[in-house]
Amino acid sequence: NEVFEKKGGFDVIVSNPPYYQIQKIKDKLYKKKLKDNFEVFDSFGDLYCLFIERSLKLLNENGVVSLITSNKWLKTSYGDKLRNYFLSKKNLLQLIDFKKTPIFKSADVDTSIVLCTNQKKNTDDTKCTLFNTIIEHNDLEKFINLNSIDIKFSPNDPWTIANKVTLNLLDKLKNIPNKLNLEKLIIKRGLLTGLNKAFIVSQDIPRVFT
C-alpha cells in the first residue's frame, strides 16, 4: 500500500477481467453502487467494462494497462459509454480484435486486447490489428507490426476493425444518400425463450420422451 500510494498507482496492470452480465446481478443495492461509481455503467452491460475503467483509475499518471476481454463492447449499444470514455480520455493506444478466432479452449468468447494509458495521445487515431486465424506465438509481434493500421473511430458509430479496403468501402456506403429513409427503421432484439435450458435442448432429450 505504501508503494502504491507513493507512486500514485500501478505502473502496469495486466488482466483478464470476468465476463458477467450486469442484468443478472440480483442485489439491487450493489447494482446501484456500480451505477453511482462507474461512468461506463450500463444496466444491460457487462462487468468487464467496469473493470477496464477501474484499471485505468488504479494506474499512476504514466501507467499502462493491458486487458484481454470480450470484443462485444466494440459494437453493442452497452459499449457506447466505454467507447466514448476512451475517445474523451484519448488514451487508447492499441486495440486487437480476434473476431471469431478461438483464443481460449475452455471459454466460448470472442476476444479483444485493449492497451491503454492515463496519458493523452497526440492523435485521434488508434493502432488496430485484426486477427482472422491463429498464428504461432513467435510470429505475434511480427504480425501486429505488419498488419496494424491507424483508425479514427467515431463516437456515434460501432467500432469496426478491418483492412483499409473494407473501411473505405464502409465510408462510401455511409455517404450514399438515404433514399429509403432507413433511419426511421427501429431494429430491436428478437424473441427470447426466457429460459434457454428448458427450450433449447439436444437431440437426445426428445428421444427419451418419445
Model-based region annotation:
Residues 3-209:
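Signature of N6-adenine DNA methyltransferases within the class I
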